[in-house]
């Protein structure tokens, strides 16, 4: 009996989603803020982040310590 109930509920959900989508597609919708400016806001935010991190990485003078090769000399081994 459980699979039968589960199948019936799935069909109800699919039909209600399809009806909702059909209902929404018939309505004329005016573009909202995200439709008008969403891509521009996303692009400007990405550009701002890239420019800021590029400046920080190249101009601020942070010592990143990427590789110690050539800068570190090994110590002599001491036998105790």
From Swiss-Prot:
Biological process, per Gene Ontology: central nervous system development; mitochondrial electron transport, cytochrome c to oxygen
InterPro entries in the cross-refs: Cyt_c_oxidase_suVIIB, Cyt_c_oxidase_suVIIB_dom_sf
Keyword Phosphoprotein: no
Entry keyword set: Membrane, Mitochondrion, Mitochondrion inner membrane, Transit peptide, Transmembrane, Transmembrane helix
Transit peptide location on this chain: 1-24
Pfam families listed in its UniProt record: COX7B
UniProt keyword Nucleotide-binding, yes or no: no
Broad class of where this protein is predominantly found: mitochondrion
Positions in the Mitochondrial matrix compartment: 25-32
Transmembrane segments: 33-59
Residue spans, topological domain Mitochondrial intermembrane: 60-80
Protein's pathway: Energy metabolism; oxidative phosphorylation
GO CC list: mitochondrial inner membrane; respiratory chain complex IV
Membrane topology: Single-pass membrane protein
Subcellular location: Mitochondrion inner membrane
SUPFAM superfamilies: Mitochondrial cytochrome c oxidase subunit VIIb
Sequence similarity: Belongs to the cytochrome c oxidase VIIb family.
Quaternary structure, from the entry: Component of the cytochrome c oxidase (complex IV, CIV), a multisubunit enzyme composed of 14 subunits. The complex is composed of a catalytic core of 3 subunits MT-CO1, MT-CO2 and MT-CO3, encoded in the mitochondrial DNA, and 11 supernumerary subunits COX4I, COX5A, COX5B, COX6A, COX6B, COX6C, COX7A, COX7B, COX7C, COX8 and NDUFA4, which are encoded in the nuclear genome.
Reported function: Component of the cytochrome c oxidase, the last enzyme in the mitochondrial electron transport chain which drives oxidative phosphorylation. The respiratory chain contains 3 multisubunit complexes succinate dehydrogenase (complex II, CII), ubiquinol-cytochrome c oxidoreductase (cytochrome b-c1 complex, complex III, CIII) and cytochrome c oxidase (complex IV, CIV), that cooperate to transfer electrons derived from NADH and succinate to molecular oxygen, creating an electrochemical gradient over the inner membrane that drives transmembrane transport and the ATP synthase.
Name of this chain's protein: Cytochrome c oxidase subunit 7B, mitochondrial
Organism for this UniProt entry: Pongo abelii
């Amino acid at each position: 009996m459980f699979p039968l109930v589960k199948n019936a509920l799935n069909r109800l959900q699919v039909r209600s989603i399809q009806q909702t989508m059909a209902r929404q597609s018939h309505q004329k919708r005016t573009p909202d803020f995200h439709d008008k400016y969403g891509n521009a806001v996303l692009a400007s935010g990405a550009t701002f982040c890239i420019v800021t991190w590029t400046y920080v990485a190249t101009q601020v003078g942070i010592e990143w310590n990427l590789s110690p090769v050539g800068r570190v000399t090994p110590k002599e081994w001491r036998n105790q």
